[in-house]
Regions:
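ATP-dependent adenylate-handling active sites, centered on carboxylate activation for C-N bond formation
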Residues: 1, 5-21, 129-132, 140, ...
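Short, intrinsically disordered low-complexity segments
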Residues: 25-26, 441, 524, 531
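Acidic, low-complexity intrinsically disordered regions
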Residues: 44, 406, 435, 442, ...
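Structural motif
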Residues: 108, 112, 171-175, 425-436, ...
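Acidic, carboxylate-rich catalytic segments that either coordinate divalent cations
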Residues: 355, 526-534
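Core structural elements
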Residues: 437-449
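Short amphipathic alpha-helical segments embedded in low-complexity Lys/Glu-rich regions
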Residues: 507-509
Length: 534
């Protein structure tokens, strides 16, 4: 079925039946210089509102939140949510004021203030018609942009713009997504492309500037990060990281009523739980399993909660699609809203529908942003990564490309363009290239796709999705981060009972025949490759 036909099918059903209209492009936004006159029709259906921002029109879906403050010729906009664990401000109107004040000092001060903020958000500043847009630390909130028929579009959902403008999917993207190799990997597109040639993706640590035309500029890093060598230094900053994560969790407890922390037995999750010490009565705790492999994690989480005296809820997600009303249609809605390249598995869709229908929480605290600091690639491939990675490494990290050498070369070309455009073709200051690759490519490309699909249910946040906190993590020695020593020291400092539960869940992703094949493919495809980027 072609994308065009699927759009028509969705429109036909939603025109007749309003029940699922709120699921289409849920929590979406669209900034454009074109006034839209049909907000009662597909794809808006009367549940999007219009806000005038300088000379632009901002359209917001009913489940999304937006905050706007104007001072003189400056307008600050936060789409989504944000909070500051450094000064404990958690009302976005106050944060908009702070951003305007910082911008008045200078661009460096402005982005330093941006880097203090935790949450899932897109931040825009409009200065006499000029737009400066950036995202949360790991760019988990989508920001796609383009100029079509001399009109600008900045949005969470490329497919929304495609529907409005009649765009056609790029044949190369279609070939990649439909290939057998695509799902053997992270299910995202190479570089900063989208399914449509007219639109591109903004990513972590960069900002979008619009001043008659679009360009991407880097604002982080601007200097070396600290290097914690002495035990005194390490102890001091273990305490600081724990305090800042705790502060962010405290901000969440103040911002929302029905707060929950989703748990597994993994390192990131346990670190968040330990840092919530002193706030445990403000949260509920849950795990789920939508396939048998997830049950081990869920049972580990329950054991930790038992050791802390916390009530834990385990949700058993039904394993049959037939248990959910209109499953096939909701699957099509999700496929459309996630731009046809996320390729969600049925068990994931069942989980999302279950949580949507449950509607039990205002905010869920997740933890996986801190993976940025855990030397993922070396732990997975069990080899020392080169100091400088290239476009081929990025392609193979993304998709295994078994039997598709033509697609592999095409992917390399997209990454060459991306790395040059973002200034990531070589290490920046004393940051390890692999760390920035994971932060800006794995998290930026894959993470934003995951969050986009999870917008179907309650709102999520990540107390560790903060640029300054991640920088502190990265300031610890490589081997200590790789062994999870840093996370374990934070747990021990914040709540030793989390460690005393003795729950250690092995990462099944790092074992088995599949990973052996991936290691072999990585070595074969990178060993003799000569980079074309320099």
């Amino acid at each position: 079925m072609s994308i065009k036909i699927l759009k028509d099918e969705i429109k036909s059903e939603l025109d007749k039946n309003p029940k699922y209209r709120e699921m289409l492009f849920r929590r979406g936004y669209l900034l454009t210089d074109k006034k839209l006159n049909s907000l009662d029709e597909y794809p808006f259906y009367g549940i999007w509102s219009e806000i005038r921002v300088d000379k632009y029109f901002l359209y917001i879906q009913q489940e999304q939140t937006v905050y706007k403050n104007t001072t003189g010729n400056l307008t600050s906009v936060i789409i989504g949510h944000a909070y500051n664990p450094f000064d404990m401000k958690y009302r976005e109107d106050d944060l908009c004021d702070d951003l305007i004040s910082a911008y008045a000092i200078g661009k460096e001060a402005y982005f330093d203030k941006v880097s203090e903020l935790t949450g899932l958000h897109v931040i825009m500043l409009i200065d006499n018609g000029k737009i400066i847009a950036c995202q949360d630390a790991c760019s988990l909130t989508g920001c796609y942009f383009g100029k079509i028929n001399n009109r600008i579009y900045i949005t969470e959902h490329p497919q929304l713009v495609a529907d409005l403008c009649g765009l056609t999917i790029d044949s190369k993207v279609e070939k990649l997504v439909e290939s057998k190799c695509y799902n053997i990997g992270n299910r995202h597109l190479p570089g900063n492309i989208t399914p449509y040639k007219e639109l591109k993706r903004l990513g972590a640590n960069t900002y979008l500037l619009y001043d008659n035309s679009f360009c991407i500029k880097r604002f982080y890093p601007i200097c070396n990060h600290p290097e914690f060598i002495t035990e005194n230094d390490k102890n001091k900053h273990i305490e600081e990281i724990g305090r800042l994560i705790h502060n962010g969790i405290d901000c969440c407890a103040k911002k929302w009523n029905r707060c929950t922390i989703s748990l597994s037995g993994g390192t990131d999750s346990k670190t968040t739980l330990a840092c919530a010490n002193g706030l445990y009565d403000k949260f509920s705790y849950f795990s789920f399993h939508s396939k048998p492999q997830e049950l081990v994690d869920a049972e580990g989480a329950k054991k930790i909660c038992d050791n802390l005296g916390l009530e834990h809820t385990l949700y058993h997600i039904p394993e049959e699609n037939s248990r959910f009303d209109d499953f096939d249609f909701i699957k099509k809605l999700l496929q459309h809203s996630t731009n046809y390249f996320v390729n969600l598995a049925d068990n994931e869709i069942r989980k999302y529908i279950f949580l949507h229908d449950l509607s039990a929480y205002d905010i869920e605290l997740k933890s996986w942003a801190s993976e940025v600091a855990r030397v993922f690639f070396e732990r997975k491939y069990e080899i020392k990564m080169p100091k400088i990675l290239n476009e081929r490494c990025a392609s193979v990290f993304q998709t295994r490309f078994f039997g598709h050498p033509g697609l592999l070369k095409w992917s390399d070309k997209q990454y060459i363009d991306f790395l040059r455009e973002t200034g990531l073709e070589k290490p920046l200051y004393n940051y390890e290239h692999t760390d920035l690759f994971y932060w800006e490519i794995r998290m930026g490309c894959w993470g934003v796709s995951v969050i986009s699909s999870q917008q179907l249910y309650h709102r999520m946040t990540m107390p560790m999705n903060n640029r300054k906190i991640l920088e502190l993590f990265l300031s610890f020695p490589h081997d200590e981060r790789k062994s999870d020593s840093v996370h374990k020291r934070i747990m021990a400092h914040m709540n030793k009972k989390v460690i005393d539960a003795e729950v250690e869940i092995p990462n099944l992703y790092f074992h088995g025949y599949r990973i052996w094949m991936e290691k072999l493919f990585f070595k074969f495809r990178t060993m003799f490759y000569r980079s074309k980027i320099i």
